[in-house]
Amino acid sequence: MDLWPWYLLYLITVVMPTCPGEAGEGYTQVTTNGEEGCVSPWQFMSSSNIYLIKSNMSYGNITCIKARTSAKDQNTQTLSHVVYVMLNSQKWFAMNATYNPLTKDANGTATAFTSVDGNVTTNYTFALLDTYYAIVRKEKGSSFEDLRESCELWVNDEYFRPDCTAKKLRCEENFCKMCEPKREMSYDCYNCTKPQ
């Protein structure tokens, strides 16, 4: 009896999912670089603060965007942010955003989120994820015809630690590789403190 097909099935279903660092590069809905340990999209999104630092889409006269977690529920994997936006004119405005799981994996862990503001829906899927950064694919619109897509690099407070220099370069390289920006837009996360 030829056991080769059974070995192949075992390799694909058991060995490869347990060794993500050994798998070849490719896009999966949720990935991690594994160096700081696995985090879920909800864990990253519910960090105290997250900051947009790069996008492949321009957001007009915006200097920085900071989202502060205002509420979270680990059981339902929902959360709310107060999103602070600073304009080039140094004027601030804030808005509230609530996120609900859009998809979950077999373990019930949210792998993507959705947020609704009026009649506009924004969906967030995670192309690459680690404890201090996430590369997020964002789809926003009120209908399929109105859909705008972007790819963004978000970081949390861990990104600003002094021992994070090499990690900063790596996450920016990953942004360029995964988002393939024709025109890369950078945002000032270092001076993005909420207004007084």
Give each language-model segment a name.
Residues D2-Q196:
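A beta-rich soluble binding module of mature secreted/lumenal proteins
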